[in-house]
Amino acid sequence: MPDNTREGSSARFVDGAIPAGLLAAVRSQRPLVHHITNGVTINDCANITICAGAAPVMAEAPEEVAGMVAAAGALVLNIGTLSAAQVEAMLIAGRRANELGIPVVLDPVGVGATEFRTATARKLLDTLDIAVLKGNAGEIGVLAGTGGSVRGVDSGGVAGDPVETARECARSTGTVVSMTGAVDVVTDGSRVFLVGNGNPAMDRLSGTGCMASSVTAAFVAVAEDYAVASAAALAAFGLAGEWGAAGARGPYTFRTALFDELAGLSPDDLAGHARIEER
């Protein structure tokens, strides 16, 4: 067997069969992913969920979310375009998901930009059992309390080491943290996974962060280890971005290619090209 441990380092690369097996499970089980998400990217999130191999539902009326989430394999809460009614729906659905053991993925879009947004993210974290907190570096830095810069919904980065910021956030919130960036960082506060798949074109298209949360939810719906599943999801999404960017002429040809590449991604493709390093 080849040695996949870097010389002089405790880091090792995760066997590609692991993310490949999770992608195969998503495709075979086709879990329902319930989204309470933002109005800007809702259609893209629904379609990327289908491309990953899962099934989306976008119900957010407080009167029906408890019933809808009961049929789901995972729940996504995305605070991109907040309202009081939507927050109520998130709390109702989140509590019901917790009762049923359904994993909840929280995307704290733009946390730190306004008091309402920040208070909502903290309320969801304090009230619900969040399985995965998926955000960019600025958002995770804000929630970690270590310093993060957010302008609108865009990240300005973190003040310190990204890995330690993500680790601190995971420890303080009790969640798996999935922090996207040039290199994605996934940690449960102890283990750290660095995901090297992706392309800068993904940063130039609105909604890729939200879509990453949808793909993450599809993977955690079929997994017991949410950190590994989150890393596998980002590797799959990032690989689709790499391959989609290769022939794209601009943001909208890239957008189409991103969907097409994820839909066409096979477990063997992911096994051979996922770049996930464990520390």
UniProtKB/Swiss-Prot annotation:
Residues given in the record as substrate binding sites: 58, 207
Cofactor(s) listed: Mg(2+)
- Claim: Cell wall biogenesis/degradation is one of the keywords in the record: no
**Sorted alphabetically, which InterPro entries does this protein's record hold?**
Hyethyz_kinase, Ribokinase-like
User: Which top EC class applies here?
Assistant: transferase
Q: What are the protein's GO molecular function terms? A: ATP binding; hydroxyethylthiazole kinase activity; magnesium ion binding
Q: In which pathway does it act?
A: Cofactor biosynthesis; thiamine diphosphate biosynthesis; 4-methyl-5-(2-phosphoethyl)-thiazole from 5-(2-hydroxyethyl)-4-methylthiazole: step 1/1
Name the residues that bind ATP.
134, 180
Write out the GO biological process terms.
Answer: thiamine biosynthetic process; thiamine diphosphate biosynthetic process
Under Enzyme Commission nomenclature, its number is 2.7.1.50
Recite the UniProt keywords alphabetically. Answer: ATP-binding, Kinase, Magnesium, Metal-binding, Nucleotide-binding, Thiamine biosynthesis, Transferase
Q: Does the keyword Cytoplasm apply?
A: no
Its recorded reaction(s) are: 5-(2-hydroxyethyl)-4-methylthiazole + ATP = 4-methyl-5-(2-phosphooxyethyl)-thiazole + ADP + H(+)
Its job: Catalyzes the phosphorylation of the hydroxyl group of 4-methyl-5-beta-hydroxyethylthiazole (THZ).
Q: Please report which protein family the annotation says this sequence is part of.
A: Belongs to the Thz kinase family.
Q: What is the name listed in the Swiss-Prot or TrEMBL entry for this protein? A: Hydroxyethylthiazole kinase
Q: What organism is recorded for this protein?
A: Methanoculleus marisnigri (strain ATCC 35101 / DSM 1498 / JR1)
